[in-house]
């Protein structure tokens, strides 16, 4: 078992260096401070005072310990947890920390508050100075633990709670590369039916915002295409993800995108000789003949800056919401079998996103229920994007 783990660890190391080639890693931390373009991103949690405060003293690099709570096992080699762990390894590499300074808790069910609390407490007992809880469902328990242990720093990924002191939230503008991947899908569909396997329904703004950004990207190049969404109601459920992808394929969808944690949608797309859009990590290795591109994370940009701030004593409790400008999110190189002209359309939109000309959720947007959101000449606020997108764009159909 030890040998098997080390083999998987070496594979992750190789993948880490591959990802280094995709991103500029902000090794000097220039341009990727911990707050990363927060704008009006919501801070208040209901737990304690929300006024941001700087940490009073740092922690020596030799003595710092970093805890990580993972939803699944990064040894799986693809998907959400794998990508976060690549980010942790990047942080470790950038800061020169030893393996003994990284404490991992894996396969922690984020719907089990007792299991979450136990994992966090174990990290505290093992001397961790900062703990990253990487899944949405860890949010409330992490907030509670932060109040109980004010001398430990807590950082929660993908949610919205924080206290402005020892507990912050981090995420990224993943809707930006989602939009670009929508362009890719819209350019390459032949049936004008595009499937999307979603972990959560419209109640979850993270997932729904990604779907809408993707649909807007599709619409920008192919207004005739329709997006069909099948929800699994779980962040990580291999069987449900496989079943959802199968349902969409049976509807004649010829591009399958996803916001879920396994590679099953990619694998099924390859088996059925249709296209796919990967998520979290580069999934072309899993479905080389299907994957048009992948929407990916470079979590090491944030993890490095956050841990460095604890070492330096400059942690201020602010939230992080970086985007393509901060290199925390991106899109992989397009497959060489993409339709001619796809790269040009992606490059044009990417340039506009980075310059700020294109905000994705711009102007008046029509929903699939006939209502509208947004205002002419304005872009949705960060707080709306992260917490209030509970609607679907007009070309989206929810599959029951």
What do these predicted regions represent?
Residues 36-400:
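A residue-level marker of the well-folded mature domains of exported/periplasmic proteins
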Residues 10-20:
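Bacterial N-terminal signal peptides that target proteins for export
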Residues 27-31:
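C-terminal motif of bacterial Sec signal peptides marking the signal peptidase cleavage site
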Residues 17, 34-36:
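Short, aromatic- and cysteine-enriched interfacial helices/patches
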Residues 5, 13-14, 26:
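Generic extreme N-terminus detector
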Residues 1-9:
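Short, Lys/Arg-enriched N-terminal segments with co-localized hydrophobic residues
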């Amino acid at each position: 078992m030890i040998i098997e783990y080390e083999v998987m660890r070496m594979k992750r190391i190789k993948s880490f260096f591959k990802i280094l080639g995709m991103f500029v890693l902000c090794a000097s931390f220039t341009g990727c401070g911990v707050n990363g373009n927060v704008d009006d991103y919501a801070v208040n949690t209901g737990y304690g005072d929300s006024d941001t405060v700087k940490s009073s003293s740092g922690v020596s690099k030799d003595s710092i310990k970093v805890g990580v709570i993972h939803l699944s096992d990064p040894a799986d080699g693809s998907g959400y947890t794998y990508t976060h762990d690549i980010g942790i390894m990047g942080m470790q590499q950038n800061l020169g920390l030893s393996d003994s300074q990284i404490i991992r808790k894996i396969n922690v069910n984020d719907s089990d508050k007792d299991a979450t609390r136990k994992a966090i407490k174990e990290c505290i007992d093992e001397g961790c100075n900062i703990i990253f809880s990487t899944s949405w469902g860890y949010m409330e328990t992490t907030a509670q633990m932060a109040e109980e242990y004010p001398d430990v720093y807590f950082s929660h990924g993908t949610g919205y709670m924080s206290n402005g002191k020892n507990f912050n939230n981090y995420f990224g503008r993943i809707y930006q590369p989602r939009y670009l991947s929508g362009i890719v899908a819209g350019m390459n569909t032949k049936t004008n039916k595009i499937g999307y396997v979603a972990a959560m329904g419209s109640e979850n703004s993270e997932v729904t915002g990604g779907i809408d950004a993707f649909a807007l990207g599709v619409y920008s190049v192919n207004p005739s295409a329709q997006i069909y969404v099948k929800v699994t109601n779980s962040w990580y459920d291999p069987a449900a993800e496989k079943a959802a992808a199968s349902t969409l394929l049976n509807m004649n969808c010829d591009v399958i995108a996803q916001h879920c944690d396994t590679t099953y949608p990619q694998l099924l797309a390859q088996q059925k000789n249709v296209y796919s859009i990967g998520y979290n990590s580069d999934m072309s290795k899993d479905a080389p003949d299907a994957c048009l591109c992948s929407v990916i994370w470079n979590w090491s940009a944030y993890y490095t800056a956050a841990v460095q701030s604890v070492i330096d004593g400059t942690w201020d409790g602010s939230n992080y919401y970086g985007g393509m400008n901060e290199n925390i999110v991106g899109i992989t190189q397009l497959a060489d079998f993409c339709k001619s002209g796809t790269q040009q359309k992606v490059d044009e939109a990417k340039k506009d996103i980075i310059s700020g000309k294109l905000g994705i959720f711009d102007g008046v947007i029509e929903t699939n229920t006939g209502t509208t959101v947004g205002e002419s000449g304005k872009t949705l606020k960060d707080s709306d994007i992260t917490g209030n997108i509970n609607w679907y764009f007009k070309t989206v159909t929810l599959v029951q």
